[in-house]
Amino acid sequence: MSQLHAVPGRTKKLPPLRVGVGGPVGSGKTTLVEMLCKTMRERWDLVVVTNDIYTKEDQRLLTVAGALEPERIIGVETGGCPHTAIREDASINLEAVDRMLEKFPNADIVFIESGGDNLAATFSPELSDLTIYVIDVAAGEKIPRKGGPGITKSDLFVINKTDLAPHVGADLSVMEADTRRMRPNRPFVMSNLKTRQGLDEVIRFIETKGLLVG
């Protein structure tokens, strides 16, 4: 949390926890952030930074969905590769986080949703304290065994849209086995966010791994 040791006006002892949410286009990142906000906002002070290449569509979607008050959601237009904006040159996102913390210095959690990217996407440790990587079953049973930093190095790996498995010929047991092999001793969650399956597990992970609770 090197960037956030001193937040002007902050009265809480611990610095805000920055949670990066990444994954390919359509995997369910925005839905996950929306549901996390709606479920956690009564207990924690939350703000969100979204990333899109040429628009602020995810910011708009979260605002329309009522995830948080509009002023607590900021959209970043990266204007290029979404991977670069969260890793090689995260300055635009670091500045957005700073702006949000100027407005809400006592925020407990800053969710940073990346633009849709490939399996090589990772967050800079200067930008994110915890990383969650989301894929969806519809992308294919083989995705977990393809590896890539998002799958092997993320703090939490989420396999979303499990309800689609029978429609796309995916075997969830194979995906689970491949995931255990590719990221031994690292947690993962099988989820269907339409029914909230897996959501509580993600929240427990954020709260415990992020040291928000004992």
UniProtKB/Swiss-Prot annotation:
GO terms for biological process: urea catabolic process. GO terms for molecular function: GTP binding; GTPase activity; nickel cation binding. Pfam families: cobW. Keywords: Chaperone, Cytoplasm, GTP-binding, Nickel insertion, Nucleotide-binding. GO terms for cellular component: cytoplasm. GTP binds at residues 23-30. Residues 1-20 are annotated as: Disordered. It is found in: Cytoplasm. Transmembrane segments: none annotated. It comes from the Bacteria. HAMAP family: UreG. NCBIfam families: ureG. Facilitates the functional incorporation of the urease nickel metallocenter. This process requires GTP hydrolysis, probably effectuated by UreG. Belongs to the SIMIBI class G3E GTPase family. UreG subfamily. Homodimer. UreD, UreF and UreG form a complex that acts as a GTP-hydrolysis-dependent molecular chaperone, activating the urease apoprotein by helping to assemble the nickel containing metallocenter of UreC. The UreE protein probably delivers the nickel. This is Urease accessory protein UreG. It comes from Leptothrix cholodnii (strain ATCC 51168 / LMG 8142 / SP-6).
